[in-house]
From Swiss-Prot:
Notes on activation and inhibition: Inhibited by tyrosine phosphorylation.
Compartment(s) where it occurs, according to its Swiss-Prot or TrEMBL record: Cell membrane; Cytoplasm, Cytosol
Name under which the protein is recorded: Proto-oncogene tyrosine-protein kinase LCK
Keywords for this protein: ATP-binding, Cell membrane, Cytoplasm, Kinase, Lipoprotein, Membrane, Myristate, Nucleotide-binding, Palmitate, Phosphoprotein, Proto-oncogene, SH2 domain, SH3 domain, Transferase, Tyrosine-protein kinase
Main function: Tyrosine kinase that plays an essential role for the selection and maturation of developing T-cell in the thymus and in mature T-cell function. Is constitutively associated with the cytoplasmic portions of the CD4 and CD8 surface receptors and plays a key role in T-cell antigen receptor(TCR)-linked signal transduction pathways.
Cellular component annotations (GO), alphabetically ordered: cytosol; membrane raft; pericentriolar material; plasma membrane
Bilayer topology: Lipid-anchor
InterPro entries for this protein: Kinase-like_dom_sf, Lck_SH2, Lck_SH3, Non-receptor_tyrosine_kinases, Prot_kinase_dom, Protein_kinase_ATP_BS, Ser-Thr/Tyr_kinase_cat_dom, SH2
Matches recorded under CDD domains: PTKc_Lck_Blk, SH2_Src_Lck, SH3_Lck
Entry's family note: Belongs to the protein kinase superfamily. Tyr protein kinase family. SRC subfamily.
Organism name: Gallus gallus
Lipidation (N-myristoyl glycine): G2
UniProt binding sites for ATP: L250, G251, A252, G253, Q254, F255, G256, E257, V258, K272
Gene name in the database record: LCK
Catalytic activity of the protein: L-tyrosyl-[protein] + ATP = O-phospho-L-tyrosyl-[protein] + ADP + H(+)
Length: 508
């Protein structure tokens, strides 16, 4: 079907692309319909049905997208992209969409996170579509951003409205983020202060980039963002060992080593190779098939496996490594209590998802939390502890058994539930606020067991807010059913400081 709009042809053309701006259909260069309709008798009421005329435009207009980044095809059937190239989406299925280039006419699969809707705000470097207030703060406070870095996001509470988030420096709080409501006008415009109104968000950004005019600071550069990693190719699950190249050893754990490497020479991944005999390959594959379906922004993504021993687990690569190690670095040791609690809230969010899926982690601690370049925390190794066939790990007397993180009922009776994960989360909170200190400092594992049986609980760490310590103590209730849910702890941690400060800055 071609363009069926009756409008000025010269104004309908997008530069270098034969697409009608009104209906998004291609305009046939040889078609007589390109000619300007001047004859009044040919003007037709669009609401009236006429016989012998071309079929009307589909009410579901084509979905046109623009490439945000270059993409080199690496698979059979995917389509290369050039930044700024426009495409028509033919089918949305999972993380790879079938599309047709409006430049070349070629069809193929494209990564959904490399494109954005044409004629929308999504291609703008300062616009972040689905971003919460907390995540906006985390992004803006991440390394690479400076005073005045900003973003505009969709409002969490008011559909169709937006919020402006700006990085600022406060004498009392240090680096902080200020939020401003962008209010909608009846005529379609926007304003932060009613003194100055704008017909578009682009105008608003341009204005406050040249003058703060009541904001905490003039807008600087848009919030830094990284080119996303393309989604894992849909058919690659059990992969040959030869497709992996181990490049840099990141660490060695109780069950094997972790490497940074590449899959098929182009996709950066983390590769965990398990010691032979540490678990049954068949049991691992069954568990891995469950794990790969647990997909959430706060869980490390499981990409693929090598199921012949030595078993390889291929996951997304997290630049900052484990949380316990990161907290001890020169960057980690400088994190404010606000940022530490934000990290705790992120972990609680991931565990709330695991809780909702009736799954159990079994080995929740800072060593099994990974940190991205933007300081986003993700939960790793969920479910693997159950498969370990090493008595040093599975027996409570074993040297590898994580006594200090394990709930009493799991130590004594091997009873692991989501409530034993809650206990472990309380211990993890102490690791976070002490910048990676080992729990129960100065105690051996047998001493920890004896003290727990007598009702001992760790004292409040230095610089730990009283309310946070009270949450820890709830996690360490003797009766598992009395411990809080992760969903509850997520809401408490996300709103920890919000209750005592304004949600938004006053109108300038």
């Amino acid at each position: 079907m071609g363009c069926c709009c009756s409008s000025d042809y010269d104004e309908d053309w997008i530069e270098n692309i034969d697409i009608c701006e009104h209906c998004n259909y291609p305009i046939d260069p040889d078609s007589k319909r390109q000619q300007l309709i001047r004859n009044v008798s040919e003007v037709r009421d669009p609401l009236v049905s006429y016989e012998a005329m071309s079929p009307p435009c589909s009410p579901l207009q084509d979905k046109l997208v623009v490439a945000l980044y270059d993409y080199e095809p690496t698979h059979d059937g995917d389509l290369g992209l050039k930044q700024g190239e426009k495409l028509r989406v033919l089918e949305e299925s999972g993380e790879w969409w079938r599309a047709q280039s409006l430049t070349t006419g070629q069809e193929g699969l494209i990564p959904h996170n490399f494109v954005a809707m044409v004629n929308s705000l999504e291609p703008e470097p300062w616009f972040f579509k689905n971003l919460s207030r907390k995540n906006a703060e985390a992004r803006l406070l991440a390394s690479g951003n400076t005073h005045g870095s900003f973003l505009i996001r969709e409002s969490e509470t008011s559909k169709g409205s937006y919020s402006l988030s700006v990085r600022d420096f406060d004498q009392n709080q240090g680096e902080t983020v200020k939020h401003y409501k962008i209010r909608n006008m009846d005529n379609g415009g926007y304003y932060i202060s009613p003194r100055v109104t704008f017909s578009s968000l682009h105008e608003l950004v341009e204005y406050y980039s040249s003058s703060s005019d009541g904001l905490c600071t003039r807008l600087g550069k848009p919030c830094r963002t990284q080119k996303p990693q393309k989604p894992w190719w849909q058919d690659e699950w059990e992969v040959p060992r030869e497709s992996l190249k181990l490049v840099e050893k990141l660490g060695a754990g109780q069950f094997g080593e972790v490497w940074m490497g590449f899959y098929n020479g182009h996709t950066k991944v983390a590769i965990k190779n398990l010691k032979q005999g540490s678990m049954s390959p068949s049991a691992f594959l069954a568990e891995a098939n469950l794990m790969k379906n647990l997909q959430h922004p706060r869980l490390v993504r499981l990409y693929a496996v090598v199921t012949k021993e030595p078993i390889y687990i291929i996951t997304e690569y997290m630049e900052k490594g484990s949380l316990v190690d990161f907290l001890k670095t020169s960057e980690g040791i400088k994190l404010s209590i606000n940022k530490l609690l934000d990290m705790a809230a992120q972990i609680a969010e991931g565990m709330a998802f695991i809780e909702a899926k009736n799954y159990i982690h079994r080995d929740l601690r800072a060593a099994n939390i990974l940190v991205s370049e933007a300081l986003c925390c993700k939960i790793a190794d969920f479910g693997l502890a159950r498969l370990i066939e090493d008595n040093e790990y599975t027996a409570r007397e074993g040297a590898k058994f994580p006594i200090k993180w394990t709930a009493p009922e799991a130590i004594n009776y091997g009873t692991f539930t989501i409530k034993s994960d809650v206990w472990s989360f309380g211990i993890l909170l102490t690791e976070i606020v002490t910048y990676g200190r080992i729990p129960y400092p100065g105690m051996t594992n047998p001493e920890v067991i004896q003290n727990l049986e007598r009702g001992y609980r760790m004292p409040q760490p230095d610089n730990c807010p009283q309310e946070l310590y009270e949450l820890m103590m709830q996690c360490w209730k003797e009766q598992p059913e009395e411990r809080p849910t992760f969903e509850y702890m997520k809401s408490v941690l996300e709103d920890f400081f919000t209750a005592t400060e304004g949600q938004y800055q006053q109108q300038p």
